[in-house]
Regions:
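Sec-dependent bacterial lipoprotein signal peptides
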Residues: 1-20
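Hydrophobic-face positions in mid-chain alpha helices that act as interaction patches
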Residues: 237, 261-431, 435, 467-476, ...
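TPR-repeat structural position
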Residues: 257, 451-452
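Membrane-proximal, proline-rich intrinsically disordered regions
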Residues: 21-76, 264, 346-351, 359, ...
Length: 573
């Protein structure tokens, strides 16, 4: 059994490697040929399974020898993006300082290479499957093609929003990234300009249309089912409902409100909103799929991200703070003093009656002088009852040394065994799409055309989180007063509901919001307490220099320049 060799798409340093009987790709292309696949039994299925199995778990960028703690797949980009705003605080500066403090973010840096390596590697995998499926795929190849089109759309959707200086609704001509599809030749790659927002989102929607066609049942003129729709066995591969969700996201981005609402509604079918018991589950909270999860990824016990570096190059190490400090002692968040916190102002805007507030340690606990009483208060958050573990996490966070704002939304897996052994505890699942997002998209999209109807939908959703919710008190503008109080209210719900799930910075860009890190009582790190009335330009990711060196048609975004020193304290939001 040999490995498929790596293919360099000029700008991609390391790409997808699959285990199969195929010896090599045609050098002039970015895909395997049909003859190669047909001569390797079962290889098509390997290509399809690799579309999702490579999303997390391996050191795709730097390799296992480097063990980078930001090199663990698609969920790493949640953190890398969202610490650029205000909703996530990174109190001790280390691995994620690049993105929180805007250090070394230019085109010649690893922060530029990282998304290029990952995303174009994933896109190459999609191109392979699309090419191998043929023009008119049948049977299992319909399922494979549908998944490939859906995922390619999702990847380009992320890239478009990360790299475009302006969102679609502001500037349709704003440049995104070069489009590489299943027909792009090596020669094409050398003169491949960045697609405009208009062209990119057209391409994304076309991919999603194809995905919908392949993943839903095929019927004849009489309505008889000729080919059944794709029936997945778990949430770790995209089906038609995920395509509906991706369309809802896309149409929200392009401002096509009716279509956004339509597809968000369709995506909700078959799923159930998380209730308090599920959202605040101390053992399975946000580490195990439930009836609200539409699409997700999971780390496996034999993943390099788990086996190498004590499991510390993984999502669990960054987000799961309940790891026994004496038995295991591992975890960047739990025991190395590098947790991610919720922004204090955002936390304080969450009413006490909203159950989502229970996922974050109350800042008032830091005012308790008696250690025994403090541990007792923290024990209310702990699955194990070990409040002293949470206290330890705060105490070892150099420069912060507090517990207020620590997150326990993303729980350690495996119960007591996982809390004692990170090789079990970090084997978690992470949602990429939840039905709650669809309810919020529907509410915003409906309300953009009929505000009263949108308010009704938003209120109905919010009252599933807080029975005492009253519309109209969460409408801070963050610099952009052109968005209505209703849109601001929708944004606040998204910030709270989807905290840590990779949406914060993308929403800031979509809504053209500023950021506010410096305010009375802030928990943001000194020297990085920046306020901006407009969307920071550092949120426009630079294209890696190797791409612009070899692709002469590709322009770049300006290298981000961080502010010097803290901003004046904000008195309003």
């Amino acid at each position: 059994m040999k490995n498929i060799i790596k293919i360099t798409l000029i700008s991609v340093a390391s790409l997808l490697v699959l285990s199969s009987c195929i010896k090599e790709f045609t050098p002039q292309t970015s895909y395997a040929t049909k003859d190669q696949v047909s001569n390797a039994p079962g290889s098509y299925d390997l290509f399809v399974s690799a579309l999702t199995s490579t999303l997390v778990g391996d050191f795709t960028y730097g390799g296992a020898d480097n063990k980078y703690p930001f090199d663990f797949g698609i969920t790493a980009f949640f953190l890398e993006r969202d610490v650029q705003g205000q909703d996530i605080v990174y109190p001790y500066q280390n691995w994620y300082t690049y993105w929180y403090a805007i250090v070394s973010m230019g085109p010649g840096t690893r922060t530029a290479q990282l998304p290029w390596t990952y995303y174009y590697g994933w896109i190459k995998g999609c191109n392979d499957v699309i090419n191998l499926s043929g023009e008119e795929p049948e049977g299992a190849k319909r399922d494979g093609a549908g998944q490939a089109y859906a995922l390619r759309a999702m990847f380009y959707m992320d890239l478009a929003r990360m790299f475009a200086p302006k969102p679609y609704t502001v500037d349709k001509n704003s440049p995104t990234v070069p489009i590489v599809n299943e027909k792009t030749s090596a020669k094409d790659l050398t003169t491949n300009p960045r697609a405009t927002n208009e062209d990119m989102w057209k391409f994304i929607i076309e991919d999603l249309d194809k995905a919908e066609g392949y993943l839903t049942a095929k019927v004849d003129e009489s309505g008889k089912v000729i080919e059944p729709g794709y029936a997945r066995k778990d949430v770790y591969s995209p089906d038609s409902t995920v395509v509906f969700g991706l369309k809802a996201r896309a149409y929200l981005e392009t401002g096509e409100w009716k279509k956004a609402a339509e597809y968000a509604k369709k995506a909700q079918n078959g799923y159930t909103l998380m209730d308090e018991a599920a959202y605040c589950d101390k053992d399975k909270g946000f580490n195990t799929p439930n009836d609200a999860w539409m699409f997700g990824v999971t780390y496996k016990a034999d993943d390099p991200n788990i086996l190498v570096n004590d499991g510390d190059s993984s999502w669990g190490s960054m987000m799961c703070i309940e790891i026994n400090p004496t038995v295991s002692g591992c975890g960047y968040a739990a025991n190395y003093g590098q947790p991610f916190l919720i922004d204090r102002h955002l936390y304080e805007t969450i009413p006490a009656t909203d159950f989502r507030k229970k996922c974050y340690v109350d800042f008032a606990i830091d005012d308790i002088d008696d250690e025994t009483a403090k541990i007792a208060a923290l024990s209310n958050y702990a699955a194990s009852g070990h409040g002293e573990w949470i206290l330890n996490t705060g105490n070892v966070t150099e420069g912060y040394n507090k517990v207020g704002g620590l997150e326990l939304k993303f729980r350690t897996a495996g119960g007591d065994a996982g809390r004692d052994n990170q090789y079990i505890g970090f084997v978690v699942a992470v949602p990429l799409m939840r039905v709650e997002e669809m309810y919020l998209i529907e509410a915003e999209a409906v309300g953009r055309e009929n505000e009263a109807d949108g308010i009704a939908l938003l209120t109905a959703f919010a009252q599933t989180r807080d029975a005492n919710y009253v519309y109209g008190i969460h409408n801070e503008a963050y610099g952009n007063t052109t968005t209505s109080p209703f849109v601001n209210e929708c944004w606040w719900q998204r910030r709270v509901e989807l905290w840590g799930e990779g949406f914060a910075t993308l929403d800031i860009k979509r809504l053209q919001k500023g950021i506010i890190r410096n305010y009375p009582g802030t928990n943001h790190t000194e020297n990085y307490r920046w306020n901006s009335a407009t969307t920071p330009t550092w949120m426009n990711t630079c294209i890696v220099q190797t791409e612009t060196n070899y692709n002469t048609a590709c322009t770049n975004n300006p290298e981000p320049v961080p502010p010097t020193g803290d901003s004046p304290v904000a008195t309003s939001f």
